[in-house]
Amino acid sequence: MDEANETAQDSVPRIDGYGFVRPAEFDYAFYEEFIARYHVVLTRRAIKWSKLLQQSAAVEKNMKVKRYIRKGIPNEHRSHVWMVVSGAQAQMDMNTGYFRRMFTEGEKNPKLLDLVITDLNRTFPDNVLFQKNANPSLQKDLYNVLVAYGQHNKTVGYCQGMNFIAGYLILVTKDEEKAFWLMDALIGQILPDYYSPAMTGLKTDQEVLGDLVKKKIPSVAQLIETHGVMWTLLVSRWFICLFIDILPVETVLRIWDCLFFEGSKVIFRVALTLIKQSQASIMEARNFPDICDKFKEITKGEFVTDCHYFMQKIFAEPGSLSKTTIDKLREKQRLKLISEEK
């Protein structure tokens, strides 16, 4: 470790504000410099958000709010804004007692309980708040949310990846019921068929990304085609975990700010930006393992740590990306997938 990193380590806590232990290779020096700049931004945004929410607790879907969300929701307002813009708050208000009822019914389903319990200890082993012996341990909240959701959405039940999403929602909302309804908004509305048994939506969107790369970053598409690499091997975790454990926590939360407001289109913007930003590095790959390594490398480093700059780039770098374009590509890939599975 160099001297600057050692000095920074004295002032940057080893455990972040969300309970995650920083990895051994963490760049303390860059983070210290970034966070000093970012605190100024956060203070400015907090003042603007407080003014906006004083006028009305209901967050309207207009251009001003869209702009505010793209510039980041301060942590103290994040839970409230996510709940309102996603429709989760309205669902929760209309269904008093539903979450608790689903949990009680779910606890009578041994198959569901086995699946959930198996994954509890695998969820964020690097987070002190999710450890079994933590007091209180968020594992209990996680268990409650996953059991209730598995019972509520019987088509999906429980599948791997959902534990990480529920975990992040619990960290942000600090409330089981809110986490449950936000999960329902994500899985039921925002992410089309990502977690269904056939994972049709997930498979479709990975191929849609391939189409978009072909159009916007043709040299990378050509490289991947030449080496016969399937997109699912490179990006399935980006989609299924919504960048959890792939990008830094604050960057993931900034992406989710936009995801709840603008929908799944944001995932393509993030993926395209990661690939475009590291195009030169990816093009150095000479074979299949090289390409896989490059796709792991592009999710690390200063570019993704500076979440504010990163978010500016995702709305500039990929150029225009209309919902119509994505809908057409989805339909094309969905039909292709169905015909291949016959």
From Swiss-Prot:
Gene3D superfamilies to which the protein is assigned, alphabetical: putative rabgap domain of human tbc1 domain family member 14 like domains, Ypt/Rab-GAP domain of gyp1p, domain 1, Ypt/Rab-GAP domain of gyp1p, domain 3
Pfam families registered for this protein in UniProt: RabGAP-TBC (PF00566)
Disulfide bonds: none
PROSITE patterns referenced in this protein's UniProt entry, alphabetically: TBC_RABGAP (PS50086)
Keywords per UniProt: GTPase activation
Gene Ontology molecular function: GTPase activator activity
Keyword 4Fe-4S carried by entry: no
Rab-GAP TBC domain location: 72-263
Organism superkingdom: Eukaryota
InterPro entries linked to this entry: Rab-GAP-TBC_dom (IPR000195), Rab-GAP_TBC_sf (IPR035969), Rab_GAP_TBC_domain (IPR050302)
Function recorded in the entry: May act as a GTPase-activating protein for Rab family protein(s).
Name of this chain's protein: Growth hormone-regulated TBC protein 1
